[in-house]
């Protein structure tokens, strides 16, 4: 059998509602890897919020973070690493417009740090940023923003986060890629224009000298649309956002709570 590239989203897909990997999922992924298939974590999360899962799964493959802005080989210097950023002016402007977009918080995300407007645990969950507690150096201050971020993350009180994403795309004249993220959380993520999970996977396939027909992808949310459409075979979770279904080749019969990805991989490869 041709060895496959298996792109897996984390939240709402590989992880359960407690943001954990089940033992069955871990065992299945390890068996798949041992057979020579390449499991690629492909997530909106920054690296610091995905690295523990990478270690738990004992992966040695590249990882895609920030919805495609960062493609890298964790823990190693890799000649094919690609790190893309967006102009910091967008971060500064969104902070000024914080009330217009009803944002609980706005954060500039970098590979190894972040700045958040409300480092307050009653407003933002520190675990969302891969830390136990917020520190003074996490406080957003305009003068601290000297470099362009990989992405901007914001949590909004607006009832329809999809409508807000559309509205912000129009406001910024489609110069950013603005996606919903985080399953049930009202979170928007802004990445560089044209950047998405498929964009990063296409780059990775070129690096690996592989064809997209050998790419399988699993996702559940709006930010997985391009990835599922691009893959040779795209699977939407049973719990997927209905808007994702037209882009998938198949919907799984099980949710992320029911180890949907692991059972699908078992049926395909074990």
Residue ranges and their predicted role:
Residues 19-35, 83-90, 130-134, 192-206, ...:
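Short, acidic loop-to-helix structural element flanking the phosphoryl-transfer center
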Residues 36-40, 59-61, 150-151, 213-214, ...:
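Short active-site oxyanion
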Residues 103-105, 109-218, 222:
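Conserved acidic, metal-coordinating active-site core of Asp-based
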Residues 1-5, 22, 188-270:
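Mg2+-dependent phosphoryl-transfer enzymes with acidic/Ser/Thr/Gly-rich catalytic loops
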Residues 57-59, 67, 171-174, 230-231, ...:
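Short, structured coil segments at secondary-structure junctions
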Residues 32, 43, 67, 152, ...:
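Residue-level signal for inorganic ion chemistry
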Residues 21-124:
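Active-site phosphate-binding/coordination module
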């Amino acid at each position: 059998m041709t060895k496959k590239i298996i792109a897996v989203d984390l939240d709402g897909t590989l992880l359960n509602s407690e943001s954990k990997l089940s033992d069955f999922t871990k065992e299945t992924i390890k068996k798949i890897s041992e057979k020579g298939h390449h499991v690629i974590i492909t997530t909106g999360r920054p690296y610091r919020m995905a690295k523990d899962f990478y270690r738990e799964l004992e992966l040695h493959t590249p990882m895609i973070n920030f919805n495609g802005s960062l493609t890298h080989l964790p823990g190693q210097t890799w000649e094919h690493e690609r790190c893309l950023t967006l102009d910091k002016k967008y971060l500064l402007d969104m902070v000024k417009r914080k009330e217009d977009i009803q944002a609980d918080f706005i954060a500039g995300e970098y590979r190894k740090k972040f700045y958040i407007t409300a480092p307050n645990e009653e407003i933002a969950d520190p675990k969302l940023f891969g830390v136990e507690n917020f520190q003074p150096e996490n406080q957003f201050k305009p003068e601290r923003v000297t470099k362009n971020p990989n992405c901007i993350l914001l949590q909004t009180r607006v009832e329809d986060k999809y409508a807000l994403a559309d509205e912000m795309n129009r406001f910024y004249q489609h110069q950013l890629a603005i996606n919903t993220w985080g399953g049930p959380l009202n979170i928007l993520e802004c990445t560089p224009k044209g950047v998405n999970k498929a964009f990063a996977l296409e780059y990775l396939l070129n690096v690996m000298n592989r064809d997209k027909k050998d790419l399988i992808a699993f996702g559940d949310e709006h930010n997985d649309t391009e990835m599922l459409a691009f893959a040779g075979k795209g699977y939407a979770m049973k719990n997927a956002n209905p808007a994702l279904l037209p882009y998938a080749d198949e919907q799984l019969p099980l949710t992320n709570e029911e180890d949907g990805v692991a059972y699908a991989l078992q049926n395909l490869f074990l």
